[in-house]
């Protein structure tokens, strides 16, 4: 495991972009599985500026969890957000976007194997320690592949999510974990220092041989380099 502690959110975002561009600039096909949400917002702003006007047709994008499309959207919730946050701003060719969906999740792992695995999975840390849609108490540490989960949501009733499981995620060549803010400090300490526990699903990720954590000082306040 490699821990990179940055001064603030801006620097965390800049460092994450450097990791992504380091992979994207390879003279070969590059497979990036990326996260939606609030944490990567600045990452995508910076990255979109850097890729505009340059040829990154070798880079292909994927998501690691998804739910049903809302309204008349072409994509599910995750991919719709990624489109808004990054794909549209970076003018990514739709042919380079390969969504995990509620329809293809059962064949997703075979598909990922066929493309040569993901070069990077970039993900954030849930406040309850979840990764992808693997929440505490979902038996997520039992070598599970991509699967369908149902959750009772306070405002939306029961929702279903397709999500990559532990085995699927651990097959990636590199896991890039982005964490910011003091509100994530306690759970990040639990992930990195505590035992591997299903009540803190992300704790299993530290077993990956190429696991990089980029955290700002606020999130890393209980850690030492």
Predicted segments — roles?
Residues 33-37, 63, 122-125, 177-180, ...:
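Short beta-strand segments
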Residues 38-39, 125-130, 182-183, 219:
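Short glycine-rich anion-binding loops that position phosphate/pyrophosphate groups of nucleotides
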Residues 46-56, 84, 136-145, 196:
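A glycine- and small-aliphatic-rich helix-loop capping segment at beta-alpha/alpha-beta transitions
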Residues 28-50:
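Glycine-rich N-terminal segment of FAD-binding domains in flavoprotein oxidoreductases
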Residues 1-32:
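N-terminal glycine-/serine-/threonine-rich phosphate-binding loop
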Residues 55-122:
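Ligand-binding beta-strand-loop-alpha-helix segment within the catalytic cores
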Residues 121-167:
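Class I SAM-dependent methyltransferase SAM-binding "motif I" and its flanking Rossmann-like core
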Residues 173-225:
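ATP/nucleoside-binding phosphotransfer catalytic cores, i.e., glycine-rich phosphate-binding loops
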């Amino acid at each position: 495991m490699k821990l990179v502690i940055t001064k603030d959110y801006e620097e965390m975002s800049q460092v994450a972009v450097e990791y992504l561009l380091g992979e994207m600039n390879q003279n070969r096909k590059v497979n990036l599985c990326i996260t939606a949400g609030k944490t990567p917002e600045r990452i995508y702003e910076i990255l979109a500026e850097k890729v505009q006007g340059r040829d990154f047709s070798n880079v292909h994008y994927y998501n690691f969890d998804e739910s049903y499309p809302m309204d008349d959207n072409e994509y599910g919730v995750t991919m719709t957000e990624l489109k808004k946050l990054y794909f549209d701003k970076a003018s990514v060719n739709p042919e380079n976007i390969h969504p995990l969906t509620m329809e293809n999740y059962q064949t997703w792992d075979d598909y990922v194997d066929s493309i040569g695995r993901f070069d990077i999975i970039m993900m954030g840390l849930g406040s309850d320690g979840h990764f992808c849609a693997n929440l505490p108490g979902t038996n997520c540490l039992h070598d599970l592949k991509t699967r369908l989960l149902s959750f009772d949501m306070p405002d939306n009733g029961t929702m279903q999510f397709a999500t990559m499981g532990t085995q699927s995620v651990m097959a990636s060549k590199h896991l890039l974990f982005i964490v910011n803010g003091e509100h994530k400090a306690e759970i990040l300490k639990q992930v990195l220092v505590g035992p591997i526990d299903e009540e803190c699903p992300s704790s299993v990720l530290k077993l990956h041989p190429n696991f990089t954590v980029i955290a700002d000082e606020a999130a890393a306040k209980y850690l030492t380099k």
